[in-house]
Amino acid sequence: MRMLPQDLHDYDDVAENYDLYLDAMYSNEDNHAGFQDFYLDFAKEYGKDGVIDIACGTGAVLLYLAEHGIYADGTDLSEAMCRVAEEKAKAKGFNLSIFPANMTEFKSARKYSCAIIARSGFMHLLTPELQRAALLNIRENLSDGGMLTFNTFDPHPFFQAQQMNTKDTDYSFRLEYTNKQGQREKIYNAISYNPYTQIMSGNWKFETLDDNGVIIEERIRPVKMRQTYRQEMKYLLEMTGYEIVNIYGGYHKESGECSAKNVIWCVRKK
């Protein structure tokens, strides 16, 4: 099933702490405020014949939907993430179908009227060929007129220039949080950018601290994501049989006409 090298989200330690450090991250960054309600509204509007949460991670959207009466299927490339999501679902009393699969090739026994790729899930497809394969495969799993939503962001020349001169060991502090074991951890990022492949690659460094602030463990986890320009995304959607219904600049349905940290695509199977 796995076609890509091991990534940040494949590691057990990342999966078990994913919700904890994202909570800390989102409390300091406003570009994800309201993301669960956006997907709940999307599922309510388009999910009458079934919803699938692709790249579901540990279930932030999947379980939020279930808590509001929408029982979606969930899939993720990371077996570790699926395992955590399933444990959380069972703890809440939900019997959901959650399975590890590659979005470029998964097959479901049913069709869905609504597919969700939340947050950065689509951006982990590292080539146009993989993006095309995913869009075509998702289309095959959608019913006629089915809807898909996914995110990109508008590449910024200033940050691209910075990252073109950054090595994967040039770490900068990102956040501090308390891990599952109750220990303080600091996270550092080092991201470089290749303008020819449009891929951001680098490492996340996790430092675990004791009660005196002394580092007692350090873990390096790799990560890669691809930047996609709107023009190429529009062409790719046209080639793969989708029509664009809306493009938003944020989870509160801000105008998508200006440059945005979150470009949220809402597209329909033609």
Where do the language-model regions lie?
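SAM-dependent methyltransferase
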Residues: 150-234
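A short acidic, Gly/Pro-enriched loop at the edge of an enzyme's catalytic core
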Residues: 107-114
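A conserved beta-strand element that flanks and buttresses the S-adenosyl-L-methionine
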Residues: 116-118
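C-terminal lobe and adjacent flexible extensions of AdoMet/dcAdoMet transferase-like proteins
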Residues: 224-270
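Conserved class I S-adenosyl-L-methionine
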Residues: 1-55
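A short glycine-rich, Lys/Arg-flanked "PGG" loop and its adjoining helix->strand segment in the class I
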Residues: 132-144
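Class I SAM-dependent methyltransferase SAM/SAH-binding core
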Residues: 59-105
